[in-house]
Amino acid sequence: MEAKKSKNRILTLFGSGETSPHMAKNYRHIIDGLSHDLQKNLLLDTPFGFQENNMILSKKIQDYFASKINLKLKSLKLTSEESYSNEHTALLSNADFIFSGPGSPTYASKIWLKHNLGDVLKNKLKSGVVMAFASAAALTLGRYVIPVYEIYKVGDLQGLNEGLNVLDFLGKDTVIVPHFNNQEGGDHDTSHCFIGKKRFNNLIDGLDVITIGIDEHTSLTFDLDKSIMNVKGLGNVYFISREGEILLKNGDSMDIKNINSNYIPKLVEKKEDLVIENDPVIDYVNIDIESLLEIRSVARNSKMYEISDKIRDLLIKYGIEIEDKESITSWKKLD
């Protein structure tokens, strides 16, 4: 009789771009390395459950996973306090894959905490699950939650809210900050998930916490079986505490044990200080031009011009010229 395969224990946090076409490879990278099939897959839709168009948003997310990742997600339909039933807990407890994303972190965390879903998610990470939490949902998994809407839209500086503390495996209180490098404000600071660096520092003043800052269009994956975390995407991930800062870039990985109960961070200035997983040396390149142009467009819209220019230079290097006309980018092979 064939032994039952144990389920992988993986948690991925997205800074943004969780349903962008160019981020599909981040999901595939995880799924391709699994030891078990993903059969019971859920969309935890609470963060945007208060929105009138929540069913439309659910459908868009389900369509993305079906077409880009080849995963069918069942919407949990836990959109409000009144909608909760014990079946929701049962479904989460038996899930193979759980995705949750945009919306209000405080709206979601209040409902999840009331029904002990934080403990359910912790137990799932112990027994085996792939969790992908992005934006608002990612915010809820720390010891504390930033009340983003309340601060950014209303100006209510009420302080941090209680989080689910799913990242307690790090052995330290955490605050997760997606959209860490946001620049949409233009003439005012919208980094640190739209509230700005100054307001964020005021929120954590006096707290002994690790701030996990995840740049936009960037993912941080914790593989609890291998005790490894790695970063993929356009930006960086920052682990910041009173003692210092650790910076992980695209392609970097590090042992989770370096940021646990004996947390003694050092400011990482040299890439060689990190444990890097490098691909084998290859002597040819197969470029997906349209995907690169899409990433470049995202970088330009986010004012990440250095990345945009590097993509242009890379394409030129391999004989591809690109031309920007208003909102349209075209390309052609160089003679």
Per-segment meaning from a language model:
Residues 48-107:
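Portal/gating segments that form or line small-molecule/metal binding sites
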Residues 2-37, 48, 52, 56-59, ...:
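C-terminal and late-domain segments of enzyme folds
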Residues 269-335:
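Structural preference for alpha-helix termini/caps and helix-kink/transition segments
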Residues 33, 91, 116-128:
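Catalytic-core regions built around general acid/base machinery
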Residues 105-115, 186-187:
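Glycine/threonine-rich flexible loop motifs
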Residues 99-102, 125-145:
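Catalytic nucleophile loop
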